[in-house]
Amino acid sequence: MSLINRKLEHVEICLYEDVQGIVSTLLEDVTLIHQAMPRMNFRDVDTRAEFLGKTLSLPLMVTGMTGGHEELGKVNAVIAEVVEELGLAMGVGSQRVAVERPETAESFKVTRRMAPTAPLVANLGLPQVTRGYGVKQFMDAIQMIEANAIAVHLNPAQELFQPEGEPEYPLSALEALRDISKELNVPVIVKESGTGMSMETAKLLADHGFKILDVSGQGGTSWIAVEMVRNRRKGNWKYESSQLFSGWGIPTAASIVETRYSVPDSYIIASGGIRNGLDVAKSISLGANIAGMANPVLHHAVRGKEQLKKFFEEVAFQLRAAMFLTGSRDVKTLRHAPLVISGKLKDWLESRGLTLSVYESIRKGA
């Protein structure tokens, strides 16, 4: 299957097949403490956040998922237009197809035309570095959308179970990426792809100079499950194995804590199963700087601009409600808001040797 057709199939599967992770985000184990006297009016809540030198109206970005085909360009155009109007940030899907097939670049370029002032994030995969991508290919992707940053995605699990996968992740690839990053004119964001980020990985990335991290944890779209569907359709021998591993990964809530704990000065994007404004609030209170959404945005975007705007407006209200009811006047205050960690998340963190009292001071200092 061509890379272009694979992109279309991925989106079709995300829209019409059940590929949500069988493991939760564990955000349900985070309880924000209600304050019966918020000490402010609801209209006083300030949801603005800083990202890539720009101010967002909400601590929220659309993380990369689509591009590489004319039909996907239409979806990107809708998302970009709404992002521009509402003051959000946006990442595009992997641009490998456009770097190698420039005739497909329009499906990505449309984002900058529709969002002239929004922070836009380009996207390439680390396996491409292993296969020879260098500064030129990275600059091609950045210039394609006049990006404010470029995300480099880590997806070893997806690559492993993909029929055409390239599970090539030697340490030399990260070292090469570090060298490439020094020649770029925008920051590099390193992101996972739905299976989460451990404290070991976060520390390794930070040691190589990467401190803007998208944890993309388990609990949202499972890209192993996406490849499981593709394996089933093709009768591929990897089907049963991909089914077995469809719940593999680190839940989003645990990924946030592990990353903040191991790299206290990192800038964390919390994505993976973020579905509403309360999820955004919990993610930030746990230690993230902003949150990211992909799958729910895709589902609303294919139904049109107004449907997507309505969705984001509802998310904004839910976030503001959580901030008001915790007495959090702004996003920084929300990061200091009292919370209770219980259940499986507490068990996870304790078994990983994370002292909650120590983490409490780390998250408040972020």
Swiss-Prot record:
One of its GO terms (cellular component) is cytoplasm. The keyword Transport does not apply. This is Isopentenyl-diphosphate delta-isomerase. Its EC number is 5.3.3.2. It is an enzyme of class 5 (isomerase). Its cofactor is FMN; NADPH; Mg(2+). Substrate binds at R6, K7, S94, Q95, R96, Q158. One of its GO terms (molecular function) is FMN binding. It catalyses: isopentenyl diphosphate = dimethylallyl diphosphate. The lineage of its organism: Archaea, Thermoproteota, Thermoprotei, Sulfolobales, Sulfolobaceae. It comes from Metallosphaera sedula (strain ATCC 51363 / DSM 5348 / JCM 9185 / NBRC 15509 / TH2). HAMAP family: Idi_2. Gene3D superfamilies: Aldolase class I.
